[in-house]
Amino acid sequence: KSGNNWYYLDSDGEMAIDTLIEDGDNYYYVDINGVMAANQWVAIENEDAGEDDEPEHYWYYFQANGKALTNGDNDKVSLKTINGKKYAFDEDGKMLFGWVDDDSAERVDDSDGDGFKEGVYYFGGEDDGAMTVGWIQLDITYDEATEDDYKYTAAAFNDDEDQSRWFYFKSNGKKVYAENGDRTKDKTING
């Protein structure tokens, strides 16, 4: 520590700069000046960028103690509130975005455009990540939409696979969908 700032020395005794540091189950980030990030969002380059459904970078939120928020040991989504909005993170501290499965607390692969089928939550785009509540219209690009019998997906699509669809998410962030083999779900919302 120097003044109000914390720094990290690597195994060679050199000050670490512009890097994510893993210390046991905790993750920290030091900036280009070696100062530990605290109470802030940081975008860190994704080494797997360019592969299927992989973003250019991942967002992390570092708390006052410098530790990245994570999902911890939870198997299910554990929501974290930051500046009045709810977010979810994986076990490594990466902010989840897009369609997210409740049971595994992981992003649903949406590279084929069918993430809406398994996704329970929707956390916006890769640079947003805030949990969706209420109505949202999303563009769906799913090549097999008109032939898919999963929960009657085909019944909701016409000849054009590239369509916009409305989804409704309850106050807990979970998607409302038809259950028990029903083709549709009638739900009174706000009235």
Which residues does each PLM region occupy?
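Extracellular adhesion/carbohydrate-binding repeat motifs centered on closely spaced tryptophans
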Residues: 1-191
